[in-house]
Amino acid sequence: VGITVEGANILTRSLIIFGQGAVRCHPWVLKEMNAAKNPDHQQGVRDFDAALFGHIGFTISNAVRSFFAAITLSRIIKAPIKGPTMRYFEHINRFSASFAFAADVAMLSLGGYLKKKESLSARLADVLSSMYLASMVLKHYENQGRPPADLPLVEYGCRLLLYQAQEQLHSFLRNFPIRWLAGLMRVLIFPRGLTYS
């Protein structure tokens, strides 16, 4: 739809990929929205409180995962497979926690203003897209039976996509409007600095 309506894909990047994806795939956001529009006010308040505290707990757990994964260069994360691509699975998991943490902080702190800050949501969409593409590279390699001739291409693709995810996440933090919160996120997401080159 976004490509047909607009050629630059700005709407697709900022609202469709991140905006709808954040609502539909998040374990708490849709519950919060449904609770807020519940006609039974008392039940809605109870449901909203439960969802909000679940959301906050989810955000804190992702912050902790992101920090410790970054400090250990993703070595504390268990990969689903062993072999030459194991480290890429670990790094994708690290960026997944970092992305979820950054997206939650943005949603909780900016609320509806995040829609107006299209460049922020577009950068988060780019992080999500890079992680998705890296996952597909690894899945294809596994589905093909791990052909040795493909390994250099897999490594190149994963390194490039992880680098792009890092750069977009860093760009998101540089442009986040609440500067003290951006600094806190930077410490938790990139405590060792930018490690992919």
Model-based region annotation:
Residues V1-S197:
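Flavin-dependent oxidoreductase catalytic core characteristic
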